[in-house]
């Protein structure tokens, strides 16, 4: 699978605002609607973030089945009616304008990365909102786990793996993972805290040697940006909601809209709503 060209290239993406952790989700969405872009890690503390993918209605069942068969990378939080750009997860939000950046796909090829997709919108699009691991970073931080990409003001690194997802109808593709370097003393806390939030990917799929996932070079992520790792840090990999984008690249549906990796939809839902005992 070829790495898609990004409009941002390899230049660092600063966090959207140094005070963004204190924003409400509504404030964040309003700023994104006005054109603010950038990774949303650390934005709107304590609120659930979501990946987005919109597909034509005649592909929606395949996508729903794909997510159902692959719940760790694709945990569904909401599915809209065809043509709807609203969601029960965020009152008054517009899914066409309220993310920092989107991706437009035609026949599996990335053709645009706008900050507003109203001109690309179609009445037959069904939108899936899928849980994002940025949500559990607050729990990790509260447990003392350093979040390296946030510390460094970078997007989280994401990698296409050698693990195939279960196919569904016309959709197939590999699992994508996000990686966070974790000091050994904090590894058990990272695993435990994330495991309590299965709706946003839950516990890691792998800790340690990246070659076990078919990843050759941690400094060359397929999406996002490489992060500096301390010498004793352990690379920890979580299933990632960019997996549907990898399925789009592999399966080549005629049209799809997605979020740009790392630039998520901010919901009004509190992370506690998805926390299990």
Curated annotation (Swiss-Prot):
| Record bears the keyword Nuclease | no
Q: What name appears for this protein in its UniProt entry?
A: Putative hydro-lyase SCO1412
Keyword line = Lyase
**Upper lineage ranks?**
Bacteria, Bacillati, Actinomycetota, Actinomycetes, Kitasatosporales
Recall the GO molecular function terms of this protein's record: lyase activity
HAMAP family to which the protein is assigned, alphabetical: Hydro_lyase
Q: Does the keyword Plastid apply?
A: no
Pfam family, any one: D-Glu_cyclase
Mind telling me which InterPro entries this protein's record contains? D-Glu_cyclase, Putative_hydro-lyase, UPF0317
| UniProt-listed Enzyme Commission number(s) | 4.2.1.-
Return the SUPFAM superfamilies for the record: PSTPO5379-like
Regarding protein family, the annotation reads:
Belongs to the D-glutamate cyclase family.
């Amino acid at each position: 699978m070829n790495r898609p060209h990004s409009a941002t290239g390899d230049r660092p993406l600063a966090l959207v605002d140094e005070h963004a952790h204190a924003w409400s989700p509504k404030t964040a969405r309003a700023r994104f609607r006005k054109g603010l872009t950038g990774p949303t890690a650390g934005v709107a503390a304590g609120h659930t973030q979501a990946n987005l993918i919109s597909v034509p209605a005649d592909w929606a069942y395949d996508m729903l089945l794909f997510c159902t068969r692959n719940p760790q990378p694709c945990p569904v939080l909401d599915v809209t009616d065809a043509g709807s750009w609203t969601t029960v997860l965020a009152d008054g939000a517009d899914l066409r304008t309220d993310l920092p950046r989107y991706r437009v796909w035609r026949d599996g090829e990335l053709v645009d990365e706008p900050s507003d997709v109203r001109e690309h919108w179609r009445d037959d699009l069904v939108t899936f909102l899928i849980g994002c691991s940025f949500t559990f970073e607050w729990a990790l931080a509260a447990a003392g786990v350093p979040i390296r990409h946030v510390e460094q003001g970078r997007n989280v690194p994401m990698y296409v793996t050698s693990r195939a997802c279960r196919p569904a109808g016309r959709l197939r593709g590999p699992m994508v993972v996000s990686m966070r370097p974790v000091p050994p003393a904090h590894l058990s806390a990272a695993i435990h805290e994330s495991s309590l939030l299965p709706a946003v990917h839950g516990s890691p799929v792998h800790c340690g040697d990246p070659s076990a996932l078919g990843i050759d070079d941690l400094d060359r992520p397929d999406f996002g940006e490489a992060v500096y790792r301390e010498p004793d840090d352990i690379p920890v990999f979580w299933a990632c909601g960019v997996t549907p984008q990898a399925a789009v690249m592999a399966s080549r549906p005629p049209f799809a809209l997605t979020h740009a990796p790392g630039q998520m939809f901010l919901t009004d839902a509190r992370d506690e709503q998805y926390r299990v005992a």
